[in-house]
Regions:
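Short amphipathic alpha-helical segments
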Residues: 149, 226, 362-368, 542
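Catalytic cores of soluble metabolic enzymes centered on carboxylation/carboxyl-transfer
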Residues: 242, 281-284, 289-488, 567-570, ...
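Conserved nucleotide-binding/hydrolysis modules and their immediate coupling elements
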Residues: 478-483, 487-508
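Short acidic-glycine loop/turn motifs at beta-strand connectors
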Residues: 156, 198-203, 262-265, 372, ...
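Catalytic P-loop NTP-binding/switch module of NTPases
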Residues: 507-547
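N-terminal beta-alpha lobe that positions the nucleotide/phosphoryl donor
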Residues: 1-257, 261-277
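Structured functional modules or segments
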Residues: 535-614
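Residue-level recognition of beta-strand microenvironments
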Residues: 185, 350, 371, 494, ...
Length: 614
């Protein structure tokens, strides 16, 4: 029997595993970097062990330190979560060599499926050894790849050699393995996967399908179960192939087999992920199971029932990220003041009200999941819940999620992996609520600050300025004997937390929350502007300011003050949340100041460089 589990991970998945362990009466152990010392997963655990340092390479990717932590804390089992070391066969061996229970598949199964070429061989899928014009387009892919790295689409035979060379170089850099292979390129196919669960007694469950076609930069955004619109033949084929993949490597535990389904309904095997997936909650909702609890039972040697439980209804999940669509999807940091969704929605998160969202790790704040008898009901429920959710803090992708769920192409289940290539610009176009600044101003009228326009005569117009969706807006109102008034609308009610406005005969209700100069009016985020700007905050035209806190990792070779630069030319690179972000010249001109140096830690708004346009 497992009595104490260390989760070799952080954030949302660590909290998720701890929840199931608590329900089972199992003691929990967390590990944490210095940056995560006060993180929610640390606060939830019964015990916690520090991994000195901040970078993932020094902490969550140090299998030796994590095994020592498990032994020191008295854990008898290790759950890897997902990401980090979850698909590292050497780590799995180190855990078992230390006499601990590994809550995952055998190391040999991890190794076999780590190589996409080896996985295809096990399933009898022949690679494209020789590419002809008839095979085009094709995809050059890293055998050990993932996340879009080490991949090149080839549409002309003349480009194949260069694509192979580039993919090999990228694969070596990203994965330390230069093996690549070529496969047919499925243009705008559907990403469909099968959840499997296997025990040590020969039983393998195929727990239905999931559709994860809505992806941006090869990262999943919205997932659902079951995959809609699959014909029974294809559904059976996908499940059978997934079970066959698991049996081919004597798999044990939870895993996912991924496919691309083309426009003709043909399935193309992608890979097998030998771990729990981020999107596992939609499968749990549909089948009424706890996959983590089943992982624990399988690891203890218990047998699964012969058949999985029946599926019921439909579930949809959306990933809420702290990222800014208006600034190249740059990860956002800062205080998360409040995160809450309406009742009936599952929220898996690794943070809570008051937590600081840092720069060091993945910017996902939470996963929101809705389950209902039908797909249409689940989609409607999730979209409405996200729209009404309180997400007070850094800028997020909330609007993208709501608009995606309500897009006609998604609603009719006609989406594919090219969805965001076609629609991202429209889905992220600013659509500010014109009444939001007035609601913010009226709520703020109950207290005066430097952000308001003070008047000796209350009946004179009051003016407050805000930025909203990247643009500046003014709100004007008056104090009268009967209360607050504004031109063009009727102020039905106004206090610091609730404003009700009537415009064109329609009443609009706004819940308002303010945190310093940050104001949340319903789902709209505004920033209050001071009436008298601080002169010390002014910067010269052409100033390049850090869009996020991070580390300057490099400056363009040979770049010095006085150099001529072209508009769009990369000048330096910032690293934040495991991603590099280019800082480019805003105009053609002269670099008159260069303040950044490699290794420098910067905060939001730090002056990096100045380009004087010519």
């Amino acid at each position: 029997m497992i009595t104490s589990v260390l989760v070799a991970n952080r954030g949302e998945i660590a909290c998720r595993v701890f929840r199931t362990c608590r329900e089972a009466g199992i003691r929990t152990v967390a590990v944490h970097s210095d940056a995560d010392e006060t993180a929610l997963h640390v606060r939830l655990a019964d015990a916690a062990v520090r991994l000195p340092g901040t970078a993932s390479a020094d902490t969550y990717l140090r299998g030796d330190l994590i095994v020592k932590a498990a032994v020191a804390a008295g854990a008898d089992a290790v759950h890897p979560g997902y990401g980090f070391l979850s698909e590292n066969a050497d780590f799995a061996r180190a855990v078992t060599d230390a006499g601990l229970t590994w809550i995952g598949p055998p190391p040999e199964a991890i190794e076999a499926m780590a190589s996409k070429t080896r996985a295809k061989e096990l399933l009898g899928i022949a690679p494209l050894d020789r590419v002809t014009e008839a095979d085009l387009p094709v995809l050059v892919k890293a055998a050990a790849g993932g996340g879009g790295r080490g991949m090149r689409v080839v549409r002309r035979l003349a480009d194949l050699d260069d694509a192979l060379t580039a993919a090999r170089a990228e694969a070596v850099s990203a994965f330390g393995d230069g093996e690549v292979f070529v496969e047919p390129y499925v243009e705008n196919g559907r990403h469909v996967e099968v959840q499997i669960l296997a025990d040590t007694h020969g039983t393998v469950w195929a727990l239905g399908t999931r559709d994860c076609s809505l992806q941006r930069r090869h990262q999943k955004v919205i997932e659902e179960a079951p995959a809609p619109g699959l014909n029974p033949r294809l559904d059976a084929e996908l499940r059978e192939t997934a079970v066959r993949a698991a049996r081919s490597v004597s798999y044990v535990g939870a895993g996912t087999v991924e496919f691309l389904v083309d426009a003709h309904g043909r399935a193309h095997f992608l890979e097998m992920n030998t771990r729990l997936q981020v999107e596992h909650p939609v499968t749990e909702a549909v089948f009424g199971v706890d996959l983590v609890a089943l992982q624990l039972r399988v690891a203890e040697g218990h047998a699964l029932e012969t058949d999985p439980p029946p599926a019921r209804g439909h579930a949809v999940e959306a990933r809420l990220y702290a990222e800014d669509p208006a600034h190249g999807w740059a990860p956002q940091t800062g205080r998360l003041h409040r995160l809450a969704v309406p009742d009936g929605i599952r929220l898996d998160t690794g943070c809570t009200d008051g937590d600081e969202i840092g720069v060091h790790y993945d910017p996902m704040l939470a996963k929101a999941v809705a389950h209902a008898p039908t797909r249409a009901e689940a989609v409607r429920r999730l979209a409405g819940a996200l729209e009404r959710a309180a997400v007070h803090g850094p800028v997020t992708n909330r609007d993208l999620l709501v608009r995606s769920l309500r897009h006609e192409e998604f609603a009719s289940a006609r989406m594919d992996t090219g969805f965001y290539d076609r629609h991202l610009a429209d889905l992220t176009a600013p659509a500010p609520d014109p009444l939001a600044p007035l609601a913010a101003a009226l709520a703020d009228a109950h207290g005066r600050s430097r952000f308001g326009g003070w008047r000796n005569v209350p009946s004179q117009p009051q003016v407050k300025r805000y930025t909203m969706a990247g643009e500046e807006h003014e709100a004007r109102y008056r104090h009268t004997r009967t209360g607050l008034t504004a031109d063009g609308v009727r102020v039905v009610h106004a206090d610091a937390r609730l404003v009700v406005l009537e415009a064109d005969g329609v009443r609009h209700r706004y819940e308002v929350a303010r945190y310093g100069d940050q104001v949340h009016v319903g789902a709209t985020r505004l920033t209050a502007l001071p009436r008298f700007p601080d002169p010390t905050a002014q910067h010269a035209p052409g100033s390049l300011l850090a869009p996020m806190p991070g580390t300057v990792v490099r400056v363009a070779e040979g770049l010095t003050e006085g150099a001529s630069v072209e508009a769009g030319q990369p000048l330096l690179w910032l690293e934040a949340m495991k991603m590099e972000h280019r800082i480019t010249a805003p105009a053609t001109g002269t670099l008159t100041a260069l303040k950044a140096v490699p290794g420098q830690q910067v905060t939001v708004g730090s002056l990096l460089a100045v380009v004087q346009a010519t």
